[in-house]
């Protein structure tokens, strides 16, 4: 009968632990690279959106200035002032790369999970449309869209707040939490004084129609 000494067994266990730690670290590094790649990709999209918006607004401003020279009116002056504000807002978004939206969404084929994520897109709902891809039977429903000057910081704070409800506790970049939306709303209102409207029960028309068939 072959016996394994305690010393050898201890060495083997330590070896397996080291190999496991190495594999875990490698997977974490891979996940972080994927996250950085995704952030860079979105940043490129945002910069293109900002540049396109700037071009459009400047063109509109030039048009209304020409109209104002020909037909002076308070209405045209107000329109130019409104465009100037939009240009200033656009420039501000370009200068503040931490500004964006924290979204809280869910999908009827993933009950009762919530996804808490961040986007810097000028129209954040475009990002939700992209997330509602072919891997989901229904579109994501939006419970909240919260603008923040430090969107990534707010997202990290909320992820930490609801860490015990995280579905995937290994991959920290999987942003799904099995937590009731009313609990999230209560924490946002009472602890963080976030006054944005929280929709506790948004409707997915495709889901409602499918259930009725």
Residue ranges with predicted function:
Residues 1-213:
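Non-catalytic accessory segments flanking enzymatic or RNA/DNA-binding domains
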